[in-house]
Amino acid sequence: MSEMRTHFPDRPQFSGFMKPCRVEGDISQLEVYGEIPKEIDGVFYRVMPDPQLPPFIENDPWFNGDGNVTAFRIQDGRASFRQRYVRTEKFMRERKAQRALLGKYRNKFTDAVEFRVRSTANTNVVFFNGQLLALKEDSPPYAMDPITLETKGLYDFEGQLPALTFTAHPKFDPVTGEMVCFGYEARGDGTPDVCYYRVSPTGQFKEVVWLVAPVVAMIHDFAVTDNWVVFPIIPQVCDIERMKQGGEHWQWSPETPLYLGVIPRRGAKGEDVKWFQYKNSFPGHTANAYEDKEGHLVIDLGLSEKNVFFWWPDAQGNAPEPSSIHSQLVRFTLNPHAEDLALPEPKILHQGNSEFYRIDDRFATHSYRHCYFDLMDPQLGTDFERIRPNLGGGYPLYNSLAHFDNATGQTEVYFPGNTHLVQEPVFIPRKDSTTEGDGWVLALVNNYATMASELHLLDTRDFTHAQAKILLPIRLRHGLHGSWVDGRDIGSQTEQLQ
């Protein structure tokens, strides 16, 4: 039986800016400094892990919290806020019990009760076929109303979902509207099975392919081109026997290479997959992928030589010092028909310590020019001595937003202030413009001086300055991922968000 706690553990991931928010509500007419262009009309959705109750696991990681979804409605130069928890099975049962019931991260053997679905729905939120989908890669999505943020329930695509898991990073084809997805550990914890599937814009499954990974390990993100799908395997491995003994789901494996699984996007069979190999390293989020003129695959992603998830060390307990971890935007180029599966050294696109890469999604799966991401550059002037007491811990620190131009190799940097750190950006296309990268970048910013959150809006034509700063009267915990949805895609009911 789990211990009932009356307060959150005295740990960095539950203190300072990371102290759980536990807030639901609406705020209209947020304060705006500067000017929001009236042509911007849509909703910025994002989700943060935000435990409603103290966990009974003392050192619970920050991203094991309940999914709390935020909707920022922007229209007519104004901004409003709405936030609701995803009513998962976990959330509802713990609310009724008035105590935590979920045990260690992705370890059902440590739970206080048996769950049908353990999802926290806390990693990403995307809009598809009229529904908002709250995603966690160990389970099916939860569907939410995009206006009210009311939870509709667990969503299996009307009984079509073939796997027990669904990626938190589905890819959308900007030409066909197709959603390309997969699930790993797709037959349950500790299984090597990967299930790949394509979904039509109206929600019909068009193809299902089962394949077997060379190791039971994490596949957090993936990449899609016109004709191929790529699965980067992170060398964090699962051992079901370790889990049964109360251990962690994941353990860093220095002996395991980075695998890139490559399979045809259409008409594939499981045995068609090729597992290309690179030295032991940590592949992060993908920026984009496409096919060059020779038919080679070009895959741009974050890469670190060290274990980015340092809180899950190797079998001997070895883990890197967090401040020593450096992730760079790199480019792998490979021939999908090659017999030699050894990957060449990737090209470093940007030397800086970066992550959370976003592009103009209208150019996804195709050759592209512009990439936007979080960057940590200590030389910019962040006052770490001042903000350190309020930082909390357990989450990645980035102090600026960057725009990298693939054509010129040049980088522009926006520095939000010496007491600020940034979260993942999203790109907003300029209305009626078809030019790649013509629009705005929007990101949530942590202000450690005021202990409140802000939205910073940058015009890509003047990237180094904020066109508008939208201030919240509350603090939002560091989140994971989100998306921008055009108001025309949601419909006229979006005025209810104002």
Swiss-Prot record:
Family matches, as Pfam families: RPE65
One GO MF term attached to the UniProt entry: carotenoid dioxygenase activity
Cofactor note: Binds 1 Fe(2+) ion per subunit.
Highest taxon of the lineage: Eukaryota
Reactions catalysed according to its record: trans-resveratrol + O2 = 3,5-dihydroxybenzaldehyde + 4-hydroxybenzaldehyde; piceatannol + O2 = 3,5-dihydroxybenzaldehyde + 3,4-dihydroxybenzaldehyde
EC number: 1.13.11.-
Binding site for piceatannol: Y105, K136, E355
Keyword vocabulary terms for this entry: Dioxygenase, Iron, Metal-binding, Oxidoreductase
Residues binding trans-resveratrol, per UniProt: Y105, K136, E355
Keyword Iron tagged: yes
Binding site for Fe cation: H169, H220, H285, H481
Residues making up the signal peptide according to the UniProt record: none
Job description of the protein: Dioxygenase that cleaves the interphenyl C-alpha-C-beta double bond of resveratrol to yield 3,5-dihydroxybenzaldehyde and 4-hydroxybenzaldehyde. Also cleaves piceatannol, a compound that differs from resveratrol only in the occurrence of an additional hydroxyl group, which leads to the production of 3,4-dihydroxybenzaldehyde and 3,5-hydroxybenzaldehyde.
Record-given protein name: Resveratrol cleavage oxygenase 1
Organism of this sequence: Aspergillus fumigatus (strain ATCC MYA-4609 / CBS 101355 / FGSC A1100 / Af293) (Neosartorya fumigata)
Encoding gene, per UniProt annotation: rco1
